[in-house]
Amino acid sequence: MEPGGDGAEDDVGAGIGPPAPGWCLRGRCRVGSQREDVGWWRSWLQQSYQAVKEKSSEALEFMKRDLTEFTQVVQRDTACTIAATASVVKEKLTTEGSSGATEKMKKGLSDFLGVISDTFAPSPDKTIDCDVITLMGTPSGTAEPYDGTKARLYSLQSDPATYCNEPDGPPELFDAWLSQFCLEEKKGEISELLVGSPSIRALYTKMVPAAVSHSEFWHRYFYKVHQLEQEQARRDALKQRAEQSISEEPGWEEEEEELAGVSPTSLKEAKVPVARPSTSPEGGPGPQSPCEENLVTPVEPPTEVTPSESSESVSLVTQIAKPPPASEAPALPKDLSQKLLEASLEEQDLAVDTGETGPPPRAQSKPHTPACRPSGPEPRPPARVETLREEILTDLRVFELNSDSGKSTPSNNGKKGSSTDISEDWEKDFDLDMTEEEVQMALSKVDASGELEDVEWEDWD
């Protein structure tokens, strides 16, 4: 049995022994490639699982966050709705009056709803309207309502340039401020800043004494604070000035009322009338009677002209725009006044010869006082025309001599030679040759007709 057994074992060992060289190499290559494929698939599966796990965890976190926010919103809205409903019901129950058991029941229900309202709805003093109040973080880690001045102060405290750089502005201002500043008086404030402001404490620990000294650190800080206070004071002053300018409305209406109160009549009354001297210029004929003096006085408006004035005198007075002072009026030459007298005499003689019955033309009306009667053989109208032209020669624009027959002379433009042209035109139109006797007769007829005319004018008045 043993030999047989040994033989069997030998056969098995012979069967298990190393195979041929070519077959053994191919088997090992196959096993190695299979192992590599299994390792790659395993790593790919692990990576895919890890990626899916990470994405799933992120999605789960987002879902949890959304659900949490949704739950909070629903709870808050529900609490607000319940509180509002309870408040409304409570108000209605308190306003409606009742008696007996109904009143007790309503009172208990009102108390219960009041407890619910106070539980779910916070009091108004504990709520913050985010649309109105803006919060800002302080260096100590707390939050407080936003203030521009405090925000700039916090920014200044946390800026390293505040302590490292030289102060802004002229050095003279810094020296003047430094001469009045005492660092010993700020010890308490420095201690509070180091305790209450982490940013200042960190910068102080980092810079002092490595970069700057203790005194330079605090001198620059307090000077920056001083400049900030000055800037804020200027802003407040500008703001106050702008508010005052907006609040003060312009008084345009008051100015218009004041201007409307000044009437044209008051302006006229304010004008000072120009006084005319009673004496006539040298070389010119002066007034011969009180009537002639009245002719050179300031003329009243046309509505107050008496009927005794002729159309010629009215047109002459109304055509004067600005009568100059008597001192500026040049003296009328004697030859010019003589020619005017001759022209008026020729016109009167023509009216007498043609048999006209109307009143002779006159330059000015005759006053009705006895002192105004003509004292000589010469007619009064030429003398009055001569006196009036002497006073208003410079401002006269149009001077017309109108006859009763309807004929008029060319216009006078205010020049001295114009009256000479008038007399020459009259001589050319009529071409009259009169002797001295005819002139005397014409003058006597003119005096007679003048007296009749005065009577007629008095009757007409």
Swiss-Prot record:
Coiled coil residues, start to end: none
Keywords, sorted A to Z: Phosphoprotein
UniProt keyword Phosphoprotein present: yes
UniProt feature, compositional bias: Polar residues: 402-421
Location of region: Disordered: 239-384, 398-430
GO cellular component: cytoplasm
Residues where Phosphothreonine is found: T387
Record field: compositional bias (Low complexity): 295-318
Source organism, top-level taxon: Eukaryota
Pfam families: BSD
Bias (Acidic residues): 250-259
Keyword Electron transport recorded: no
Positions carrying Phosphoserine: S123, S197, S418, S419, S449
InterPro entries: BSD_dom, BSD_dom_sf, BSD_domain-containing
Domain (BSD): residue spans on this chain: 177-229
TM region(s), chain numbering: none
Protein name: BSD domain-containing protein 1
